[in-house]
């Protein structure tokens, strides 16, 4: 049965300048926009009446843990994206699809293990990252919400890398912008 999929061919034929604009500009916009996640969270949390400063301190304590989670999801995704890019260049779509399936499975497993481990040891982890008796409640409340959606976060960061490396940097940027807007809308709820 012949393959009907096509791989982006501009990587082998377009000039470096054009490719740089096509891939780097959406990447820069997406990375800049993704920094808004924590800024928007900080704005809403900082305005909590009576406890804004403690809540902001609790939020700041969670950043290293959230960065570690993001790094693990991205690690799996970038590794798979690299393999998929090579396979698409070779027009080996069957193996590329297997790598994609393995990436999804591995990111689900890693995300779930990370979530379970963190929920089991959340207080000691937060103390390790600088929580105090005054900020622990806020850090725990925020991090528990983040951890319950952690598998989705792992999948998002992993699949976003694959989308970008498969020749769709604008789609990857659009997904990032969508999640930033969604986060901004859902934060007050």
What residues fall within each predicted segment?
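Short alpha-helical transmembrane segments in multi-pass integral membrane proteins
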Residues: 1-24, 84-151, 189
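Alpha-helical transmembrane segments of multi-pass membrane transporters
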Residues: 118, 171-189
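Residue-level recognition of transmembrane alpha-helices
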Residues: 24, 31, 60-63, 107, ...
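Residue-level signal for short hydrophobic patches within transmembrane helices
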Residues: 17-36, 40, 65-72, 148, ...
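Small-residue-rich hydrophobic transmembrane alpha-helices
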Residues: 56-116, 153-172
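Hydrophobic/aromatic residues within transmembrane alpha-helices of membrane transport systems
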Residues: 29, 41-45, 59, 84, ...
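Interfacial/gating helices of multi-pass transporter permease domains
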Residues: 45-67, 134-138
């Amino acid at each position: 049965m012949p393959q009907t999929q096509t791989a982006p061919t501009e990587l082998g034929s377009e000039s470096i300048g054009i490719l740089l604009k096509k891939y780097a500009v959406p990447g820069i916009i997406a990375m800049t926009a993704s920094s808004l996640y924590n800024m928007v969270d900080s704005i809403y949390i900082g305005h909590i009446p009576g406890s804004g400063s403690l809540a902001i301190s609790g939020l700041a304590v969670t950043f290293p843990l959230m960065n570690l989670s993001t790094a693990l999801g991205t690690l799996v995704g970038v590794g798979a994206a690299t393999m998929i890019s090579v396979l698409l260049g070779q027009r080996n779509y069957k193996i590329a699809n297997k790598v994609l399936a393995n990436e999804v499975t591995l990111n689900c497993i890693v995300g779930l293990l990370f979530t379970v481990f963190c929920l089991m040891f959340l207080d000691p982890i937060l103390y390790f990252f600088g929580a105090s008796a005054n900020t622990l409640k806020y850090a725990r409340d925020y991090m528990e919400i983040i951890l319950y959606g952690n598998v989705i976060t792992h999948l998002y960061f992993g699949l976003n890398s694959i989308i970008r490396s498969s020749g769709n940097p604008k789609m990857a940027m659009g997904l990032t912008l969508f999640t930033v807007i969604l986060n901004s809308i859902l934060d007050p709820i």
